[in-house]
Amino acid sequence: MVEQSKVPSSSLCPPDKIIFDEERGEYICTETGEVIEERIIDQGPEWRAFTPEEKEKRSRVGGPLNQTIHDMGISTVIDWKDKDAMGRSLDPKRRLEVLRWRKWQIRTRIQSSIDRNLAQAMNELERIGNLLNLPKAVKDEAALIYRKAVEKGLVRGRSIESVVAASIYAACRRMKMARTLDEIAQFTKANRKEVARCYRLILRELDIEVPVSDPKDYVTRIGTLLSLSGITMKHAAEIIEKAKNSGLTAGKDPAGLAAAAIYIAALLNDERRTQKEIAQVAGVTEVTVRNRYKELTQELKIQIPSQ
């Protein structure tokens, strides 16, 4: 059935009996078979969407919103190529004029204190995200968390760097991206203690729920960076699963447990890596790897072949 407003007024067929044939571009009466109107141009999209999110994603009207840009990418930008619409280079006088326009355009984009804060924060977030090789989805989540923190006034009296780092860590935890607080803190001016304090504040004030970190989430990343085989990584995951069942993981740093499991699995599969190598990649200390190694081998009765 088609909408009443779309039915030709000259038709005697009841509106609920009229259908639209998309392939032929015709309005047809289902009772009589009469072609009421033909050669209709369908002005709707050729794609289908079943949810508002899908509709927004597939729509080609305007650019997509980008959480990692302070104004979400909805403002215009004057190109730096200094060329006209025909692709010809501008003369020096015109180039200076465009330069002045560009400066004023940038100033109008960042007017309020919140705009300046977001502009600085999004640049910092993009920088840290690139250094950590985070996917766009995680960076978008971190940007959304930071924006909520700004709306709540949580940034006031705190450094932008520490709140950005805390937002990134919260996003990583929410999306099960294996990154430790130490890894993130090393790429920012803020110290680890300050980032941890901001992280706890964000969780409490924004009522954000994060899943408990699973040591197995760290195994693939650590193993890949150490160029270990899939068999060794699978063995490490099995060791962690046994440790969970034995209650050895409660209250322990997941990165440290994953590092120790990787160390044990590498020894058992003759892909030896030093504790120092593994500790550096996992972002933990050698002492942590050594202590977790002793606990796992003793409690799980794992026999390590003599070196």
Swiss-Prot record:
Top-level taxon in the UniProt lineage: Archaea
Keywords for this protein: Repeat, Transcription, Transcription regulation
The name this protein goes by in its record: Transcription initiation factor IIB
Stated role: Stabilizes TBP binding to an archaeal box-A promoter. Also responsible for recruiting RNA polymerase II to the pre-initiation complex (DNA-TBP-TFIIB).
Signal peptide range in chain numbering: none
Pfam family, one: TFIIB
CDD domains: CYCLIN_TFIIB_archaea_like_rpt1, CYCLIN_TFIIB_archaea_like_rpt2
The Sequence repeat ranges on this chain: 123-206, 217-298
Family matches, as SUPFAM superfamilies: Cyclin-like, Zinc beta-ribbon
Gene Ontology MF terms: DNA-binding transcription factor activity; TBP-class protein binding
InterPro entries assigned to the protein according to its UniProt record, in alphabetical order: Cyclin-like_dom, Cyclin-like_sf, TFIIB, TFIIB_arc, TFIIB_CS, TFIIB_cyclin, Znf_TFIIB
Sequence similarity: Belongs to the TFIIB family.
One GO cellular component, as annotated: transcription preinitiation complex
Lineage: Archaea, Thermoproteota, Thermoprotei, Sulfolobales, Sulfolobaceae
GO biological process: transcription preinitiation complex assembly
